[in-house]
């Protein structure tokens, strides 16, 4: 897999949180305004003009989460990966972009190839900002990577004979291996337990 996973999904979570914060401020303001108008309280109405200006100049808090926001709002396909593979003489046997989440897109790839797979939880590439934001939101970072989507990284398979070549390519990680279709699609957790991908 190229790049890292879960960042776009966590960027969406940050955007949604800031949207909620903004609308809560607007709702509270409208409630105060309605009360002040009903009471015809000119002092409160005057004070609410300042509060309205503050709401109108609302700036979301994206500090330390710029990478996540960019991954959500400005996704980029990793075109350089294809060039790196060509230069290394590696011909993928199957490839898909990760737009629906690693789990879903890996299942598509396996279905099309009539194969199964095993992926390792501890091999899934996750950026520090993604991990920190998952912790802040009390979300499981593996769940964000498996089910988040919109990362637009490349998920691909290569022949075993090319494994040594792939290790030298920056921003590409081997996260698992292909099996017979009858063995299904599973995540091997950090503790060694296997969980079926859904």
Feature-to-residue mapping (PLM):
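Intein/HINT protein-splicing elements and their conserved insertion hotspots or analogous self-processing inserts
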Residues: 23-58, 71-76, 169-198
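Glycine/charged-rich beta-loop-alpha catalytic/anionic-binding loops adjacent to active sites
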Residues: 62-68, 89, 137
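Glycine-/charge-enriched secondary-structure boundary and capping motifs
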Residues: 86-198
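Active-site rim beta-loop-alpha module in soluble metabolic enzymes
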Residues: 9, 15, 69-89, 94-102
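Gly/Ser/Thr-rich active-site loops/lids in small-molecule metabolic enzymes
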Residues: 19-32, 63-67, 112-127
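Glycine-rich anion-binding loops of enzyme active sites
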Residues: 1-18, 42, 53, 177
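Short acidic/histidine- and often glycine-rich active-site loop of Leloir-type glycosyltransferases
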Residues: 56, 63, 99
